Amino acid sequence: MKITFISDTHTNMYDKRYKELMLPEGDILCFSGDLMTSGHNEGELIHFLKWFSKQPFKCKIFIAGNHDRYLENYPLLANDFISKFKNEGVVYLNNSSFEYKGIKFYGTPHQPYFCGWAFNVPDCEKLMHTYQQIPDDTDILLTHCPPFGILDKSHQPNYSNPTGEECLGSKELKKVLDEKTERNCQPKVVAFGHIHGDGGKKEKIGKTLYINASLCDEYYDPTNSIISIDF
C-alpha cells in the first residue's frame, strides 16, 4: 500500500502553483492540516476540496490546522461542503478514526496555544486529555502539531525563537506518545506539519516513523519534499 503524506499547502485559490501541482499516484493521501491561507472564507475550503479530490489516490484523508479557521468556526457548513466530495474518496477527521483496508487512522487538529489561531488549546490539561483519546490500536496518527523535540524546529530566528533552533512541538503530545510506547501500543506512523522548517523530513524512533509533511517552506513556497512510504 503506497501512502503519501503532505501538509501545510496553505492553498491559495489564486496561486497557479497549486493548480498545477499533481502528486504521484498512490493508494492513500494523508494531509495534516493548514489547507487554507487566511482560513476565513468558504471559497478557500471549496478550492482546496476541488484540488484535493482530483489527486490520484483512492482514499484522501485530511485534518485541519491552525490556519483553517472556517472549519472550526463553521463546522456544520464545512462538513456539508466536505460531504459533497465523499464519493471521490475524501475523508475529514476531527478527533475521529477511520479505517481503510485494515489500516486504522486517527486525526486531531488540536495544538498548543499559538496567537489565538484555530484549534488552539491554551489549557495544557485539556490538550493532554484531547491527545489521550487517541486509540491504542491506531496505525497512522495525523496531527497538525509535531510532538516536542521531533522535527519541530523552524531554523528561522524570530521574536519568539531567537536562535531558530528551539523545539516548538507539543510536550503534551510527546508525553502521550511516550506513554503508548511504554505500553507497546504506539502508532506505526505519526504525520504532522505546522513547523515548516523541518518539512519534508522523516525520522524513525523505535517502532514509529515520524513525518513532518509540510509542503511549504518558511517563506510559504511549496518547495519541501513530498514523502511517500510503502505500508
Regions found by a protein language model. Give the residues of each.
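Core dinuclear metal-dependent hydrolase active-site scaffold
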Residues: 1-18, 94-135, 216-229
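Active-site neighborhood of phospho(di)ester-bond hydrolases with catalytic His/Asp-centered motifs
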Residues: 5-7, 29-34, 60-66, 93-94, ...
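Core catalytic region of metal-dependent phosphoesterases/phosphodiesterases
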Residues: 6, 11-100, 167-169
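Short glycine-/acidic-enriched loop or helix-start segments at secondary-structure transitions
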Residues: 15-16, 40-41, 72-74, 104, ...
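Short, conserved loop/helix-junction motifs that constitute active-site signature segments
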Residues: 21-24, 52-57, 84-87, 134-136, ...
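Active-site-proximal segments of metal-dependent phosphoesterases and phosphodiesterases across multiple
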Residues: 36, 44, 114-115, 137-186
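Short, electropositive alpha-helical surface patch
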Residues: 81-86, 159-160, 167-169, 204-216
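Binuclear metal-dependent phosphoesterase catalytic core
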Residues: 97-101, 172-185, 189, 196-231
